[in-house]
Regions:
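Absolute protein N-terminus
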Residues: 1-3, 68
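Conserved hydrophobic/aromatic packing and binding residues within compact polymer-binding modules
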Residues: 6, 20-21, 31-34, 60
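Short, charged recognition helix plus adjacent turn
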Residues: 12, 33, 51, 61-68
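Conserved functional loop/turn residues at catalytic and ligand-binding sites
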Residues: 14, 19, 35-38, 54, ...
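Short, basic-rich loop-to-helix N-cap that marks the start of a DNA-contacting helix
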Residues: 38-48, 67
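Short basic helix-loop element that most often maps to the first helix and adjoining turn
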Residues: 4-23, 48
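DNA major-groove recognition helix of helix-turn-helix/homeodomain DNA-binding modules
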Residues: 25, 44-59
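Recognition helix of helix-turn-helix/homeodomain-like DNA-binding domains
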Residues: 25-40
Length: 68
């Protein structure tokens, strides 16, 4: 669920994985691991993603269908 939501939000905003990785200060591969759900972000990164997309962490994690 988390990876799907990240991918959907990124595509809606028309942002590349490279741009997001740079924003987060991580490698592109590190970001790709989030979208493929091979790795989970730490709380700092999760909060940065929620802020970037203007959604709640609960939405990102699939705990809620409400974005804000």
């Amino acid at each position: 669920m988390f990876g799907e939501r990240l991918r959907q939000l990124r595509r809606e905003r028309k942002v590349s994985q490279k741009e997001l990785a740079e924003y987060l200060g991580i490698s592109i591969r590190g970001y790709q691991f989030y979208e493929s759900e091979d790795n989970e972000p730490n709380i700092k990164t999760l909060l940065a993603l929620a802020d970037f997309y203007g959604v709640t962490t609960d939405y990102l994690l699939g705990r809620s269908d409400r974005r804000n």
